[in-house]
Amino acid sequence: MKNPTPILLAIGVLTFTNCDTLKQTAGQMATDAINQQMGGGNTTSKPILSKDEAIKGLKEALLVGVNKGTDRLGAVGAFAKNPSYKIPLPPDVQAVEQKIRDNRILNKLIGGELDKVVDAMNTGAENSMKKAVPIFKKAVTEMSFQDAMGILTGGEGAATDYLRKTTESDLQGAFKPEVKKAMDGVSLTKIWNPVVTQINKNKRILGLDNDIQTDLNQYVTEKATTALFQEVEKEENNIRKDPVTRTTEILKKAFNYADQQRK
C-alpha cells in the first residue's frame, strides 16, 4: 500500500485553505451588509448616506420645524384665533366658570377678568415663542446613529416623537422661565391672583371642595410646548411627503435615502 501521508496532508491543506476562504467570505459578506445598511456598496463606491449625514439630516429637519413652528405660533392671534391651540381656562376654573357667570355678583366681580386671563395666557404663549428656538436647538444636539437611522426610515412624526420623549421634560424646564417673562409682560399674574382669591373665597357657593391652586405658568408652558411639538411634526411630515420642501442638500440626501428604503 502506498504511503497515505502526502494525500492526507494535501487534503488538510485544502481543508484549512477552504476554511480560511469561508471565513474571509463570511467576513466580507458581513462588511457588505453593514455597508449596505449604511447606504453604501463595496469599498470603492461612495456610501449613499453616512452616519454624520443621517444625523445632520434629521437635526436639520427638526430645526426647520422649530423655526417655522415658532414663526407661525409667534404671530399675533396664533393661539387665540386657532381652535387647535387656543389656551382655555385651567380645568379647575373651567369647572366653575358657568356658575361664576350665572351668579350676578361674582360675574360682575370676575366675569370679565376670566376673559382677560384667557387673552393674557394666549398672548403670553405667542410672545414666548421667540425664546424657544435656542432651547430646542440645544435639545437636538445628542442623537445616536442607531436612533437616527431608525427615525429617518420610520413613519410620520418619528423624529418629533423621539424629540418629545427624550427632551420634553427638560425643554419645559428651560422654557418655563421664558413663558413666565412673557406672562409678566402681559400682567397675567395681576389679573389671575384676584380671580383665584374670589373663587376660593366663594368656593362653597361654587361647590368647590378645595381651593384653586393651579400653577398657571406651568399650565401655559405645557400648552405652548405641546403646540410647538405639533407644529414641528407638521413640518417633519411635509419634508417626508413632499420632496419640494427639502430645501437643502443634506435634507435631500437624507430623506431621499429614506424614500428608497421604504420602497
Regions found by a protein language model. Give the residues of each.
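Bacterial N-terminal signal peptides that target proteins for export
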Residues: 1-7
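Bacterial N-terminal signal peptides
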Residues: 8-15
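N-terminal Sec signal peptide cleavage junction
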Residues: 19-20
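A cross-kingdom marker for long, charged
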Residues: 24-33, 37, 217, 222-263
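N-terminal Sec/ER secretory leader and immediately downstream segment
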Residues: 28-120
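Extracytoplasmic
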Residues: 57, 82-84, 146, 223, ...
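Mid-length scaffold segments of soluble, non-membrane domains
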Residues: 107-182
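An amphipathic alpha-helical core segment
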Residues: 178-223
